[in-house]
Regions:
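Membrane-proximal helix-turn-helix segments that form the acceptor-binding/catalytic region
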Residues: 130-151
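Short hydrophobic beta-strand element within catalytic cores of glycosyltransferases
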Residues: 291-294
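Helix-loop-beta element that forms the nucleotide-linked donor phosphate-binding surface
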Residues: 146-147, 153, 159-179, 187
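Aromatic "clamp/platform" in nucleotide-sugar-dependent glycosyltransferases that forms part
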Residues: 274
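Conserved acidic donor-binding segment of nucleotide-sugar-dependent glycosyltransferases
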Residues: 308-317, 325-331
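Conserved donor-binding/catalytic core segment of Leloir-type glycosyltransferases
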Residues: 188-205, 209-224
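Active-site proximal beta-strand in glycosyltransferases
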Residues: 91, 103-127
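Nucleotide-activated donor-binding/catalytic signature segment of Leloir-type glycosyltransferases, i.e.
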Residues: 232-257
């Protein structure tokens, strides 16, 4: 089977796409991969070098939520239709909801990694203000959901959110994200420290919660590259854990190997997000045997269940208390680290994710063939 996949290099979708593409090719599939957003750096595409059955087509079409997204959506749609005509895939795997209604004679599966309306609700606690752009966006996504052969979400919460915002799809499926466990080291001796990933200025990730109270153990936040917008708290920007008033150190973007080392050393991972449909970084932390301390939101409760410690929703005091309790009880910390590790290996591994997608591909393709 030949699958055309769309992706972008702006966030964790690229990591998810890499795991899926590698898994599909290992099972005999051919993959044409199209990326949007930004042209990736060479280190972001190095993984493709060993894949003979992968054709990669990078583009700079902007995503639907970016400035100029409306025009680029039209141009991107025309480009994809032409590419489908040229490459003749058996199925489209579209990692952007807006393209679900492409006028092409092949099945279309779209994956809801996130969207602007559900993001806004989660971050601001209210509906977004009406505008000409929002009207276009709602109409585009609703049409895409209605026309797609299947809509996939990485959690039941996200599937329900998409359904309530844009209507029901012809076929709905929940397929959890997955990572290859062999990439992570769960056996290194842990340091009594907390790791978090996200920009301090990102209201959805809200890692800034970790800076609002004095922490009892060192905390490292990765991804806060803009020093001018940091909260007013004493933090250091070097590569060592800070012993400042907040016990927080801030690092810029890290390579994957650097991140894996940080995961392997940190005893705890703080998932502070108020909007997290999938939680890829938490999967990576769990596969590194970090104990998870998570914001108490429905999506994270659904994904991690009893394999994590939860703090009161969006509450910095409760987060600091959870860190204090877990760091002070080594047996409890190891217990939760092992729970997260086992759950991630069983439920959120790349092999299982790929198998689930292949099953869906075959169902959708056979249904289309029968209908024809």
């Amino acid at each position: 089977m030949h699958v055309l996949i769309t992706s972008d290099t702006m966030n964790g979708i690229w990591t998810y796409t890499r795991e899926l593409a590698c898994g599909l090719i290992a099972r005999g599939f051919r993959v044409t991969l199209v990326s949007f957003g930004e042209i990736p750096m060479p280190e972001q595409t190095a993984w493709m070098d060993r894949l003979q059955d992968l054709r990669y087509v990078p583009t700079a079409f902007r995503l639907d939520w970016m400035d100029g997204g409306e025009q680029h959506f039209e141009e991107g749609s025309e480009f994809l239709c032409a590419l489908v005509k040229e490459t003749k895939p058996d199925l489209l795997h579209l990692n952007h909801l807006c393209y679900g209604a492409l006028s092409v004679p092949v099945p279309r599966i779209v994956v809801a990694h996130g969207d602007m309306v559900t993001w806004w609700r989660a971050v601001h606690g209210r509906e977004p203000k009406e505008s000409a752009w929002l009207k276009w966006y709602r109409k585009t996504i609703s049409h895409a959901v209605a026309e797609a052969d299947a809509v996939v979400a990485p959690s039941e919460w996200m599937q329900c959110a998409v359904r309530s915002s844009y209507g029901a799809a012809a076929r709905e499926s929940v397929i959890h994200h997955g990572r290859n466990p062999v990439l992570f080291n769960p056996y290194i001796q842990k340091e009594d420290s907390v790791l978090a990933i996200g920009r301090l200025v990102d209201p959805a990730k809200q890692v800034s919660l970790l800076t609002l109270q004095k922490q009892t153990v060192p905390v490292c936040i990765v991804g806060a590259e803009n020093a001018d917008h940091r909260p007013q708290a004493l933090m250091r920007t070097d590569v060592k854990f800070s012993d400042g008033n907040t016990g927080v150190a801030v690092r810029g973007a890290q390579t994957e190997s650097q991140l894996r080392l940080l995961y392997s050393k940190a005893a705890m991972y703080a998932g502070t997000a108020r909007y997290e449909p999938s939680g890829m970084t938490m999967i990576e932390a769990a596969l590194s045997r970090c104990a998870l301390i998570l914001n108490d939101i429905p999506a994270l409760r659904e994904i991690w269940g009893q394999a994590a410690v939860y703090f009161r929703t969006n509450d910095a005091d409760s987060l600091a208390e959870a860190v204090r309790i877990l760091s002070g009880d080594l047996q409890m910390r190891r217990n939760f680290a092992n729970r997260a590790f086992q759950r991630a290996r069983e439920c959120f591994n790349a092999h299982r994710m790929t198998d689930n997608y292949i099953q869906l591909y075959r169902k959708v393709a056979s249904q289309q063939a029968w209908a024809a």
